[in-house]
């Protein structure tokens, strides 16, 4: 005989089920976030440091918090990864798992006494302090985060950004980029959108991709291998858009490879860059940087720099021998060109120069010129010996006639872009005396003597930092 289920029992059962669902949702919503979940999904760059692996490689655990923020890492759980990231509004963030909240509080109190940070405030279930180094720090028993650098007037914006990250359910750990990042080998793993790197620094990567590709759609994944006398960073350039990937692959084949013909000169020069390029692509890329765009606009008021650079096709190199105190370089830029009559309008240029204040343009030979204004002096022309269009500082005019430091390679695979910096020479330049840039480089490259970057076919790149 079947039992009749009363209406009251049905209502009670449904009520209990609904209560359980609501409780589960509330628990999910209110459950404390993992420290890794503080990183926003739209982060433009993320660096993942695994201290345990790093200690095995180098014998100790570097303290990025000390070198960047000016604080010790007391209370941080070094058994778990540390993260640095770039927020969508382009602040730099650090986040780590907390092992001992009291140790952090003790350290902050000492800094307050030393007037290196402001007294701690508490709200939104977080402790907050403003570090004199320009960082806003927030922490609790689970995580410690710092965001900056900024000035005191930016504290409200930094606070809003941290609060938004804490309260958001949209985090980097739920993205495909995070899964790809974790697959990278090494103790230090990196993800970055190409637009997270400011111009002109991202040009090293952009020289190996089509100029019309949106940098925001291009991703770089990398890992660092730390050896006894060098650090090697291997990276892969890719995109979530398959059309972009196909465009980069096609561009590599069209661009062609180079080989370095004079390694000794590269090692002894402050700065060397070499690649193979087509003029229109090069010109389009140079104009993405405001400083270079302004420089070209200034030159175009007197000469047709756009036409000259647009005519190039083949090897393109740049050498810098010195930087002045204001970072003005002594340089030699050369590019292969087969174009004739590049200077057919030279007489018009010289007449135009006469109408401009403090501008002098002289023709020193059929295909050679000297240009000066109140900011710079420049030799430019075409050398028949090596078919090189050149723009050079007067003191490096002899380099214009010398063979290119790189040559085209007939191999289908190899180097697309080469870049070398002699750090010993860089640190000796007058522009490094004031300390700001020197301190940054000394902090991130302690004891290093040279940096070499190579972009390779297959959307790969490597950075070698020699100690």
Report residues per predicted region:
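N-terminal Sec-pathway targeting helices
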Residues: 2-20
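Leucine-rich, highly hydrophobic segment in Treponema pallidum outer-membrane-associated proteins
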Residues: 16-23, 165-275, 420-467
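Membrane-interface motif at the C-terminal end of an N-terminal transmembrane signal
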Residues: 21-40
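Short amphipathic beta-strand starts and helix->beta connectors
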Residues: 30-33, 73-82, 216-220, 254-259, ...
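Single conserved position on a long alpha-helix in the C-terminal lobe of the eukaryotic protein kinase
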Residues: 47, 74-177, 313-415
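Short extracytoplasmic
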Residues: 48-70
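Primarily extracytoplasmic ectodomains and periplasmic/lumenal surface modules that are beta-strand-rich
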Residues: 52-56, 90-92, 101-103, 279-282
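Extended non-catalytic domains of envelope/secretory-pathway proteins
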Residues: 252-253, 259-326, 336-343
């Amino acid at each position: 005989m079947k039992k009749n289920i009363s209406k009251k029992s049905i209502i009670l059962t449904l009520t209990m089920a609904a209560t359980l669902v609501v409780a589960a949702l509330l628990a999910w919503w209110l459950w404390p976030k993992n420290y890794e979940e503080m990183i926003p999904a739209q982060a433009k760059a993320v660096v993942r440091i695994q201290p345990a692996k790093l200690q095995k490689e180098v014998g100790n655990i570097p303290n990025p918090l000390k070198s960047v923020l000016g604080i010790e890492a007391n209370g941080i759980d070094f058994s778990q990864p540390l993260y640095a990231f770039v927020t969508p509004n382009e602040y730099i963030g650090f986040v780590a798992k907390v092992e001992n909240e009291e140790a952090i509080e003790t350290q902050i109190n000492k800094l307050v006494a030393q007037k290196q940070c402001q007294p701690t405030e508490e709200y939104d279930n977080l402790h907050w302090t403003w570090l004199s180094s320009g960082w806003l720090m927030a922490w609790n028993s689970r995580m410690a985060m710092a965001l900056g650098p900024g000035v005191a007037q930016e504290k409200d914006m930094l606070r809003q950004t941290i609060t938004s990250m804490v309260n958001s359910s949209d985090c980097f750990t739920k993205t495909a980029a995070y899964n790809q990042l974790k697959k990278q080998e090494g103790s230090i793993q990196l993800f970055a959108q190409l637009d997270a790197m400011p111009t002109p620094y991202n040009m090293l990567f952009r020289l190996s991709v089509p100029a019309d590709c949106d940098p925001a759609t291009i991703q770089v994944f990398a890992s660092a291998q730390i050896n006894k006398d060098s650090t090697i960073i291997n990276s892969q350039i890719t995109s979530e858009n398959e059309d972009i990937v196909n465009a980069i692959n096609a561009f590599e084949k069209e661009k062609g490879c180079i080989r370095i013909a004079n390694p000794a000169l590269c090692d002894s020069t402050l700065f060397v860059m070499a690649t193979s390029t087509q003029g229109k692509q090069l010109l389009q890329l140079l104009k993405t940087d405001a400083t270079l765009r302004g420089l070209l606009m200034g030159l175009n008021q007197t000469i047709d720099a756009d036409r000259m650079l647009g005519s190039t096709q083949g090897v393109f190199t740049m050498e810098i021998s010195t930087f002045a105190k204001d970072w003005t370089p002594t340089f030699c830029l050369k590019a292969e060109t087969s174009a004739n009559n590049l200077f057919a309008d030279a007489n018009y240029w010289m007449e135009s120069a006469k109408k401009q204040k403090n501008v002098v343009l002289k023709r020193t030979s059929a295909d050679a010129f000297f240009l000066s204004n109140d900011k710079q002096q420049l030799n430019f022309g075409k050398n028949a010996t090596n078919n090189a269009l050149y723009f050079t500082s007067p003191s490096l005019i002899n380099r214009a006639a010398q063979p290119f430091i790189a040559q085209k390679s007939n191999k289908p695979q190899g180097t697309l872009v080469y870049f070398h910096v002699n750090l010993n020479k860089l640190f000796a330049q007058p522009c490094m005396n004031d300390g700001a840039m020197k301190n940054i480089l000394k902090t991130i490259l302690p004891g290093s003597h040279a940096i070499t970057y190579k972009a390779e076919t297959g959307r790969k790149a490597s950075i070698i930092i020699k100690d």
